[in-house]
Amino acid sequence: MAGAAILAVNLKVTGIGNDIEVSNSQALTVPVEAMSGYTVVDTATTTAIQLFDFVTSIALAKIYGVYLKAVKGTIYIGVDTAGTGTITNLTADLVLNEGEATYIPVNPEGNLGMVIDGAAVTDAVQWVILGAA
């Protein structure tokens, strides 16, 4: 999504004596990369999913935020961690029950990553990952 957006405003005022018409446009840079998706955690309870497994075009060092929503079941999140070991309700930094959502800011300078797991192999998470262009 990085690129440019054009903001255009056209204003026309009539009926007050002197008609006025003003047009203006401005190019705005959009310095954000974003990816989103829906993932069924089919390896739940055996292998967690690492954050960078979700993204294909944003480097881990460029990621600055993650929106997560538990669409089905219970989602376990481990922050500032790497690896694919399993996470439980006792070891998770954050637990999202079905329907709950959260935004997690990510420190790209000192972040090892993020790991997401589920309580069952049918649990699913919806995600949006934001990164600097």
Predicted regions: what is each one?
Residues 2-21, 25, 117-133:
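C-terminal interaction-tip segments
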Residues 49-60, 104-108:
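Extracellular and analogous surface-interaction loops
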Residues 13-54:
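Transition segment at domain starts
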Residues 63-68, 112-116:
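Buried hydrophobic-core signal for structured, non-transmembrane domains
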Residues 2-4, 40-42, 50-56, 67-77, ...:
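Surface-exposed, well-ordered secondary-structure segments
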Residues 60-63, 69-90:
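Short, surface-exposed beta-strand/strand-loop-strand elements in extracellular ectodomains
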Residues 88-111:
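Intrinsically disordered, low-complexity Pro/Gly/Ser/Thr-rich segments with frequent PxxP/GP/PP motifs
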Residues 105-123:
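Noncatalytic modules at the cell exterior or secretory-pathway interfaces
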